[in-house]
């Protein structure tokens, strides 16, 4: 279903544009890209080291109507926002040749550090990351890890 919905929109695009186009119908966006340090890079399921990380999130409330519609069709789910995030991001990651990871799942990934590196955010005295445009109305719903094969010929994060 996802390929039918967005496949034609992303098939011929560079990776960064394909990620943005795939996330947009769900009110999500690529929030930042980073190339992880080899020693701290998360491993993919095949055991290789990830070569690029795309943080996926929302800024403002654009995702909220999409999530609410989904939630009305899936009542009674525990942790509905986490479940929705997985239902959206996992198939997009697979379609684009990546793997999804989430802040709610083990092994824990350093989303706060990734956000500071990818978006240049600084923690407030309380430890919260406050975005210069969105303030506290932003969040990281997941990340897509890409291996060397998925990023071949592209410059992740470059327009």
Show which residues each predicted segment covers:
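Auxiliary alpha/beta "docking" domains used to position bulky ligands
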Residues: 2-158
């Amino acid at each position: 279903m996802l390929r039918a919905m967005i496949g034609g929109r992303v098939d011929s695009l560079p990776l960064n544009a394909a990620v943005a186009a795939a996330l947009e119908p769900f009110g999500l966006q690529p929030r930042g890209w980073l190339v992880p340090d080899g020693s701290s890079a998360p491993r993919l399921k095949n055991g290789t080291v990830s070569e690029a990380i795309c943080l996926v999130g929302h800024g403002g409330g654009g995702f909220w109507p999409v999530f609410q519609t989904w939630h009305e069709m899936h009542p009674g789910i525990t942790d509905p926002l986490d479940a929705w995030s997985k239902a959206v991001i996992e198939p997009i990651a697979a379609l684009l040749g990546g793997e999804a990871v989430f802040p709610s799942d083990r092994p824990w990934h350093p989303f706060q550090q990734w956000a500071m590196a990818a978006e240049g955010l600084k923690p407030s005295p309380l430890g919260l990351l406050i975005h210069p445009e969105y303030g506290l109305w932003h969040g990281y719903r997941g990340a897509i890890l890409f291996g060397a094969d998925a990023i071949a010929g592209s410059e992740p994060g470059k327009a």
